[in-house]
């Protein structure tokens, strides 16, 4: 085809990336793409915003199953919904793409950057950017904010909506029966 081949340029040429993952459907196409480019994602599940706990467990278990099926490492950050509530206090009524989203992204990506720093991983990125409901600008701002505290960690600003990945994500979602499709397109 004439379509320009989708190129992945990892900061510093890292071959291992800490991937903050919001859920299996969003991460599947990204993980597949990384692996095709010989980049190994270490999956970091840090989503204290998900409520109730049952929903959190369902999503976490799906991510874990998916990671294990590919032989990938998955790290479960502790579920701390109370801490999350404290962080977004007073912003509960904010709309999608509002101030609460930015604060939530910052909290989750700061945790991701901290884990990367403590475990010798030099690059982080997130599957949050795959959803067209989220603001790419907010996600990138949160990623830069998160890595500012850790000079040894770089935030990889990759637009995961390009290169046919959105279509691939939808195809994977259709092929794999995920339980919480209601949260997606």
Which ranges hold each PLM region?
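ATP-dependent adenylation/nucleotidyltransferase module used to activate substrates
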Residues: 1-163
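Short, surface-exposed amphipathic charged segments that create phosphate/polyanion-binding patches used
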Residues: 88-95, 167-177
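Conserved small/polar residues in nucleotide/adenosyl-binding loops
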Residues: 179-185
């Amino acid at each position: 085809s004439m379509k320009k081949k989708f190129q992945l340029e990892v900061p510093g040429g890292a071959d291992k990336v800490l991937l903050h993952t919001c859920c299996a459907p969003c991460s599947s196409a990204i993980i597949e793409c990384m692996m095709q480019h010989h980049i190994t994602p270490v999956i970091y599940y840090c989503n204290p915003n998900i409520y109730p706990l049952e929903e959190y467990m369902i999503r976490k278990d799906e991510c874990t199953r998916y990671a294990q099926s590919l032989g990938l490492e998955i790290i479960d950050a502790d579920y701390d919904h109370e801490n999350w509530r404290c962080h977004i206090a007073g912003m509960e009524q904010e709309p999608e793409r509002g101030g609460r989203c930015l604060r939530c992204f910052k909290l989750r990506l700061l945790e991701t950057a901290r884990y990367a720093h403590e475990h010798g991983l030099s690059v982080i990125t997130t599957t949050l950017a795959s959803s067209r409901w989220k603001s790419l600008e907010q996600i990138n701002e949160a990623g830069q904010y998160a890595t500012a505290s850790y000079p040894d960690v770089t935030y990889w600003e990759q637009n995961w909506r390009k290169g046919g990945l959105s279509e691939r994500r939808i195809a994977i979602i259709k092929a794999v029966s995920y339980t919480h499709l209601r949260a997606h397109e």
